[in-house]
């Protein structure tokens, strides 16, 4: 039995995960996305009012597709908060192999490119990044408390950076 093909919107968003990392937001044309997704330009505009709307959706799609991988990652099994933080950093280090387009963060890349020109995309990327950082805050807070550093650093700040 064959696996059902994702709908056109999902195929467009999936195509963007690679194209946006290879070319950047500005250099990725609607036509390129359509070709990669195997859909027409009309299908693109059926699902997205503009390329900017696509950019906002792409940031959310990045979150939706990467969050389960991070949630299931082995670093959560480390025995202490500090060990989990170091295991997370080890995971991130292991992820940065090969060409940048293979491992770079779509939200981070787009945020850097469009922060002055596309506020809606910039905000969506910021929400994606902050949302991921929030998943690390509890371990940072516990490690800070465990090591008596509460007056020196803040969990949310460390998680975001």
Language model: regions and residue ranges:
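Short, charged helix-capping/linker segments at alpha-helix termini
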Residues: 26-27, 148-156
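Helix-turn-helix
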Residues: 11, 15-53, 57
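Short helix-capping/turn signature of helix-turn-helix
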Residues: 48, 109-117
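N-terminal intrinsically disordered/low-complexity leader segments
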Residues: 1-7, 144-147
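Hydrophobic alpha-helical connector segments
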Residues: 57, 71-103, 155-161
């Amino acid at each position: 039995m064959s696996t059902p093909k994702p709908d056109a919107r999902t195929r467009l968003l999936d195509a963007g995960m690679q194209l946006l990392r290879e070319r950047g937001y500005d250099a990725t044309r609607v036509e390129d996305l359509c070709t990669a997704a195997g859909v027409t330009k009309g299908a693109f505009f059926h699902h997205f009012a503009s390329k900017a709307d696509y950019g906002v959706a792409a940031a959310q799609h990045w979150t939706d597709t990467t969050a389960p991988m991070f949630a299931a990652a082995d670093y959560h099994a480390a025995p202490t908060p500090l060990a989990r933080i170091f295991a997370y950093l080890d995971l991130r280090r292991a992820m940065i192999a090969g060409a940048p387009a293979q491992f770079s963060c779509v939200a981070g890349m787009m945020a850097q490119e469009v922060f002055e020109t596309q506020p809606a995309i910039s905000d969506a990327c910021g929400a994606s990044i902050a949302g991921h950082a929030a998943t690390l805050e509890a371990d940072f807070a516990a490690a800070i408390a465990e090591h008596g550093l509460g007056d020196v650093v803040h969990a949310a700040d460390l998680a975001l950076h």
